[in-house]
Amino acid sequence: AINEYWHGANMSFALCSLLTQGLIDAFTLVGTEEEKKTYLPKFNSGAWTGTMNLTEPQSGTDLATIKTKAEHDGENWRIKGQKIYITYGEHDMSENIIHLVLARTEGAPEGIKGISTFIIPKFLKDESGEYTIRNDLKCISIEHKMGIKASPTAVMSYGENEGAIGYMLGEEGRGIEYMLSLIHI
């Protein structure tokens, strides 16, 4: 009931928590115990927020044609690509923004069966355990919209240098399934 009041009072602001709730659901559904321990307390406290990154400039809603790539360097997944229409993709309301990003791994089949979901934090953990290291991602621009103007909608770029460090959520090739569970379709 409280969400109904909140969304009715200010949908622009409420969208941030709505997306974060989707990430909570996704981590609860397919996250490892370590991922749940790392992310869920931060999401639940509001210290961190979350986004979902599906759409690309050349693909629109045809997710089978996304070009964002995920390459494993032996230690980490390195993500390179661009996403558009990312609600709350960049803001200063939380200590960290956790992006769930759809990307295609090397050698993956064409179409949606070759897409995986990656966890890409804006800030990575440093040697002391604090999240202070800036990941290789950036907001290219904030969209100019006719409505819901108080909700920043970003164009995000991943991996303009070495590649944004990402962590695969769940199993390889099940990215569409996980992302759709996030939005309850």
What are the residue ranges of the model-derived segments?
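Internal helix-loop-helix
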Residues: A1-K37, P41, S45-G46, S94-I98, ...
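Gly/Pro-rich turn-and-neighbor structural signature
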Residues: F27-E71, W77-R78, I84
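Structured core elements
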Residues: T51-N53, K67-E71, R78-K80, Y85-T87, ...
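Short Gly/Pro-enriched turn/cap motifs at secondary-structure boundaries
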Residues: Q58-T61, E90-D92, P109, K145-P152
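A short core secondary-structure module
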Residues: N76, K80-E130
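Flexible, small-/acidic-enriched active-site or ligand-binding loops
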Residues: E130-S157
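Long, acidic (Asp/Glu-rich), low-complexity accessory segments flanking structured domains
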Residues: E160-E177
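Conserved small/polar residues in nucleotide/adenosyl-binding loops
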Residues: I183-I185
